[in-house]
UniProtKB/Swiss-Prot annotation:
GO terms for biological process: protein transport by the Tat complex. Gene3D superfamilies: 1.20.5.3310. It comes from Saccharophagus degradans (strain 2-40 / ATCC 43961 / DSM 17024). It is a single-pass membrane protein. NCBIfam families: PRK02958.1 (NF002813), tatAE (TIGR01411). This is Sec-independent protein translocase protein TatA. Residues 50-83 are annotated as: Disordered. The lineage of its organism: Bacteria, Pseudomonadati, Pseudomonadota, Gammaproteobacteria, Cellvibrionales.
Length: 83
């Protein structure tokens, strides 16, 4: 028994019929197209994750710069009040 009650011989017969109907060149082309689509999808997902990470880093830098500016302003204010 193979997958779900289908024997290996039944799978081989189906494979032979598919090869006869479509031919090896067309199946090879379909396989290549499918592989290219999967590769493109993975690339798009990784690009999206990279863009999110860059946005988070930019936000962190912005917050750090704002905090530094606020600290500097507070320091200058204290110096002015001390005089």
């Amino acid at each position: 028994m193979g997958l779900g009650g289908i024997s290996i011989w039944q799978l081989l017969i189906v494979l032979v019929i598919v090869l006869l109907l479509f031919g090896t060149k067309r199946l090879k082309g379909l396989g290549g197209d499918l592989g290219g689509a999967i590769k493109g999808f993975k690339k798009a997902m990784s690009d999206d994750e990279a863009a999110k990470q860059e946005a988070e880093e930019a936000e962190q830098k912005k917050v750090a710069a704002e905090e530094a500016a606020a600290a500097k302003t507070a320091e200058q204010k204290e110096k002015t009040e001390a005089k």
